[in-house]
């Protein structure tokens, strides 16, 4: 008597029908991106941007740290850190602010710039492009940079795309036709998928007329309207946005204050940890999990300016907001003032160091099981989880929370394996040995 009941020819009918669905899911959800995600984006008005902006911000951040937290104990008290953790991270924060104070900068033609006469915005678009080109020549750009244009609403659509074109045209003229590494355009206040489609079309057109390689221009979405959470028919809006933007979309950034205002929340209660914000961020996570699109949280708008106790209160609030983001799976956020950089890195470093031992055990065990399964011919279909565990170490190492040597020691991986940035490739390398 046969061990199974369903005949093979009958089984094949519905098993084969799964092919299209499984392929579609694999294409839509490739897993976490192995590329380096910045831990923050620093925003600054386009009229203020200079080629040496990153180093100047670093100097101001170091000055703030030296003045308001000159030692680990003071920093621990100011932002509520375990003193032992503060001892471990303090020199690392100083080193980061000296070596690479800004990971990502956004030249802002929207809220940070305001509404100005057309000739004025035209001029600043070209001046900002000149400064970026100069920074490219001088080697003073942060690892990632971009511009935020105005929304593609009826009021601003032509103004927005003119700034996009003016900036890029001048930049390519002054940079021998090259874009900066990791250049991105930020599209704000999206209310309809057609706006995302138009942004993608503008990128297509610019690349065509300037003879740029297809896909060179990438953009990120601001999620700061209720229409970017749910569409008018009640469906989640982000999948449609992503479909319209295609492979050009690299990130989705949450806009705390516009979103809470759109929800009718009064100014006194518009802040990062409002339950309405958690809801929106969780919708973003569910909609974009596994797509490889980065998520970024918003900004703390209480600036660390004034007497020592005022700065310390602002620092503690900022550190709490950063930690809230990290705990909820948002590994990037916005900084609006140079004195927020010390607390950004302190909070991020503390977060990664606190979870390092547990992450180390999980990754070591996971790699062993995955390699064994593959070695004996079994199908290992959880590479996405492995990439997520690997990304913990890559994030910690990239931002400066741990050194490459510490990552090798804790992860059980070799330098070559870590630098591959790919869990699947690590498995292949181990099987070949």
Describe every region a protein language model picked out.
Residues 1-433:
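Expand to "…catalyze enediolate/carbanion chemistry for C-C bond making/breaking, isomerization
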